């Protein structure tokens, strides 16, 4: 997590990108292979007149998730949804990432003995079947990948004391996600996390956003009126990349402060550890869009500090949920490294990475390195790879370690590969070529003048 005093608009974590073929939020991919989920049962009809348990804040109940499975969930908050005229409860599924927290109707909670008994009986049957299956051990690496894919939340006991304290403080501040969904462009999107929209905007169950200027509104009527008045059809700033229907705009946070602040508030709905939103001037934003006759529709973005003391080439990165698993996340990652190459520097995303961010970055780094190792003939060092790719040596070492392609020998890391091993990895869907790649010929960009002066002095 970024330090509280940091002047960062989006500097807390890198998140919200799902690699192609990787599960999105809520999808369950087990290490053991697909199996019937525990607690999956159609809700039985309670007996007539059967009393219900009163829902109390802070208590734990069985709750039916959108995939029809039942899980223990803590009730965090309640509200009356004025837009839909009903009482709702905000629940956190015990042991799951807070991304899956949601507002639910009362009828999704097991509040009668009939419903609780039916769910319990089904769970016991599942556990009995599971116990009869042969035991299968998983490696530490498999467990890590399983936890990342399935959004398994780390317990405080698994964190170091400093991280645990910061995590508890962050969770207390952002515990309740009031904005449950947004409407932007042609999409209605479920929010994943709390975002600090100002005043009563932040307490609305649903917000409407203009996809061009990113103005947010409480009411559909206001939104429809705005669409008829708004003159924007693309992000502000300068278009620096165009190929086919893919376009990227460079937006300076100092020149377009309101737009960038609105972008940060939008992004926070899908990023957990993003702590600062309004001091956007130290950042440059790169907005990825899909272009058609109506205009340039925002797909995602990444931001970077104008001057990063830690050598980060990305402060925050996000692909909006409707566009995930289509190659845009890796395109944004690749684009950030193309800028680093033009600056003649190496860079790395700001840490910590989210679970989805780790998967996408590791997949991208692996593909880039495997492509070079497949075609290269001769001696190649980790420093050489770093200069060729603008990926830091630490990121290269950790990636090669995950591929079993590096050994520590006589005080240094040595690349140890065979053509067969490289080809085997490249056949894996995890390391296949991204569906959308950056064409450097179409990139019209040069480093800022003050950076060009520094480069000329090197």
Curated annotation (Swiss-Prot):
Q: Which residues carry this modification: Phosphoserine?
A: 37, 42, 348
Keywords noted in UniProt? Acetylation, Activator, Acyltransferase, Chromatin regulator, Chromosome, Metal-binding, Mitochondrion, Nucleus, Phosphoprotein, Transcription, Transcription regulation, Transferase, Zinc, Zinc-finger
Residues recorded as bearing N6-acetyllysine in the entry: 113, 274
Q: Which PROSITE patterns match?
A: MYST_HAT (PS51726)
Modification after translation, per record: Acetylation at Lys-274 facilitates cognate substrate Lys-binding and acetylation. Although considered as an autoacetylation event, acetylation at Lys-274 probably takes place via a non-enzymatic process following acetyl-CoA-binding, which primes KAT8 for cognate protein-lysine acetylation. Deacetylated by SIRT1.
Task: Report which superkingdom the organism of origin falls in.
Answer: Eukaryota
Region (Sufficient for interaction with KANSL1) residue ranges read: 174-458
The catalysed reaction is:
L-lysyl-[histone] + acetyl-CoA = N(6)-acetyl-L-lysyl-[histone] + CoA + H(+); L-lysyl-[protein] + acetyl-CoA = N(6)-acetyl-L-lysyl-[protein] + CoA + H(+); propanoyl-CoA + L-lysyl-[protein] = N(6)-propanoyl-L-lysyl-[protein] + CoA + H(+)
List the residue ranges of the region (Disordered): 1-52
Q: What is its EC number?
A: 2.3.1.48, 2.3.1.-
Q: Which residues bind Zn(2+)?
A: 210, 213, 226, 230
| Activity regulation (record text) | The acetyltransferase activity is inhibited by anacardic acid derivatives.
What are the catalytic residues? 350
Q: According to the UniProt entry, which residues carry N-acetylalanine?
A: 2
Pinpoint motif Nuclear localization signal by residue range. Answer: 140-149
From the Swiss-Prot or TrEMBL record, state where the protein is found: Nucleus; Chromosome; Mitochondrion
Listed Low complexity bias regions: 1-14
Q: Where are the zinc fingers (C2HC MYST-type)?
A: 207-232
Q: What class of enzyme is it?
A: transferase
Give a GO biological-process term. myeloid cell differentiation
Residues at which acetyl-CoA binds = 317, 319, 325-327, 329-330, 354, 363, 408, 432
GO cellular component, alphabetical, reads: chromosome; histone acetyltransferase complex; kinetochore; mitochondrion; MLL1 complex; MSL complex; NSL complex; NuA4 histone acetyltransferase complex
Q: Which family does it belong to?
A: Belongs to the MYST (SAS/MOZ) family.
What does the record give as the function of this protein? Histone acetyltransferase that catalyzes histone H4 acetylation at 'Lys-5'- and 'Lys-8' (H4K5ac and H4K8ac) or 'Lys-16' (H4K16ac), depending on the context. Catalytic component of the MSL histone acetyltransferase complex, a multiprotein complex that mediates the majority of histone H4 acetylation at 'Lys-16' (H4K16ac), an epigenetic mark that prevents chromatin compaction. H4K16ac constitutes the only acetylation mark intergenerationally transmitted and regulates key biological processes, such as oogenesis, embryonic stem cell pluripotency, hematopoiesis or glucose metabolism.
Q: What assembly does the database describe for this protein? A: Component of a multisubunit histone acetyltransferase complex (MSL) at least composed of the MOF/KAT8, MSL1/hampin, MSL2L1 and MSL3L1. Component of the NSL complex at least composed of MOF/KAT8, KANSL1, KANSL2, KANSL3, MCRS1, PHF20, OGT1/OGT, WDR5 and HCFC1. Component of some MLL1/MLL complex, at least composed of the core components KMT2A/MLL1, ASH2L, HCFC1, WDR5 and RBBP5, as well as the facultative components BACC1, CHD8, E2F6, HSP70, INO80C, KANSL1, LAS1L, MAX, MCRS1, MGA, MOF/KAT8, PELP1, PHF20, PRP31, RING2, RUVB1/TIP49A, RUVB2/TIP49B, SENP3, TAF1, TAF4, TAF6, TAF7, TAF9 and TEX10.
Instruction: Spell out the protein name for this chain.
Output: Histone acetyltransferase KAT8
Organism from which the protein derives = Rattus norvegicus
